[in-house]
């Protein structure tokens, strides 16, 4: 396993990935989150997406063994146009994905609410290295999830500097 940044490790540990979980990762980037999540799956699966071709390529290279084993599918697509192949998800993971606090995202949140199982969750994590942005991130992302039918709570870590906005279904 390649080096996993502390912020990603903290977020994935917080999600408490179970071996049978079905997850969606939004914005897989270099694949660190996907690698760590897949290392915890047995019968579960991860569907990872990114709008960036380079992000998808990096994740595919980094996680080739998990793709071959059938635990990971990676696609270049935007959440707004996604048709999730998994009927039901236990968890949705996103790290530093600005969609949920910088623009209107009711359609995307509705899609997630439709796909996340009762008791499941949407886990939006952000580096909180810019403290002046954190209150706005929390307020806007929380509002997006609440308006979409999720029960929201916030978690905060000082080391690593991460804030999480968690929406439970």
Where on the chain are the PLM-derived regions?
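Conserved beta-strand signature within the Rossmann-like core of class I S-adenosyl-L-methionine
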Residues: 119-127
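Conserved SAM/SAH-binding beta-strand->alpha-helix loop
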Residues: 52
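Conserved SAM-binding loop
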Residues: 59-60
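Conserved SAM-binding loop and adjacent beta-strand
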Residues: 1-12
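A short acidic, Gly/Pro-enriched loop at the edge of an enzyme's catalytic core
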Residues: 80-92
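A short glycine-rich, Lys/Arg-flanked "PGG" loop and its adjoining helix->strand segment in the class I
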Residues: 106-118
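Conserved SAM-binding loop of SAM-dependent methyltransferases across substrates and taxa
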Residues: 30-42
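A short SAM/SAH-binding and catalytic strip from SAM-dependent methyltransferases
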Residues: 90-104
């Amino acid at each position: 396993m390649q080096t996993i940044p502390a912020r990603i490790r903290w977020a994935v540990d917080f999600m408490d990935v179970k071996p049978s979980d079905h997850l969606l990762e939004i914005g897989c980037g270099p694949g660190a989150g996907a690698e760590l999540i897949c290392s915890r799956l047995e019968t579960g699966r991860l569907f990872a997406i990114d709008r960036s071709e380079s992000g998808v390529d990096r994740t595919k290279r980094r996680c080739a063994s998990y793709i071959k084993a059938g635990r990971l599918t990676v696609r270049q697509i935007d959440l707004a146009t996604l048709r999730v192949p998994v009927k039901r998800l236990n968890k949705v993971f996103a790290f530093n994905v600005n969609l949920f606090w910088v623009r209107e995202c009711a359609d995307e949140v509705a899609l997630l609410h439709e796909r996340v199982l009762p008791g499941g969750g949407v886990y939006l994590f952000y580096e909180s290295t810019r403290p002046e942005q954190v209150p706005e991130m929390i307020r806007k992302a929380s509002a997006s999830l609440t308006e979409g039918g999720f029960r929201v709570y916030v978690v905060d870590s000082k080391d690593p500097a991460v804030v999480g906005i968690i929406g439970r279904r």
